Amino acid sequence: MYAIIKTGGKQIKVEEGQTVYIEKLAAEAGETVTFEDVLFVGGDNVKVGNPTVEGATVTAKVEKQGRAKKITVFRYKPKKNVHKKQGHRQPYTKVTIEKINA
């Protein structure tokens, strides 16, 4: 059984026991979080939401909070002496999917 959930402005396909990296959540490591924006549930009994599946939830356990690898953002305009270099590290939350309730 799998589900498509909406979190952090993205849609993610998840299965039970899977570990996924999502946009940062306000939860500490070891806590349990519930996703209620379930858009689709697949498997033996398929359910499609309009826009979400009523009564469907996905439960996950927060493994850790972290920050992704650093990327360099560079802005440049020729002949204008404009150079701007900036780094960015996106925060993320690592979660393990425990149960899909449909």
From Swiss-Prot:
Per its record, what are the GO molecular function terms? rRNA binding; structural constituent of ribosome
Which top-level group of life is the source organism from? Answer: Bacteria
Q: Does the keyword Ribonucleoprotein apply?
A: yes
Keywords assigned: Ribonucleoprotein, Ribosomal protein, RNA-binding, rRNA-binding
| Gene Ontology, cellular component aspect | cytoplasm; ribonucleoprotein complex; ribosome
Parts forming coiled coils: none
Keyword rRNA-binding in the entry? The reply is yes
Similarity remark: Belongs to the bacterial ribosomal protein bL21 family.
Free-text function comment from the UniProt entry: This protein binds to 23S rRNA in the presence of protein L20.
Assembly information from the UniProt record:
Part of the 50S ribosomal subunit. Contacts protein L20.
Q: Report the NCBIfam families cross-referenced here.
A: L21
Please report the name of this protein according to its UniProt entry: Large ribosomal subunit protein bL21
Species the sequence originates in:
Bacillus subtilis (strain 168)
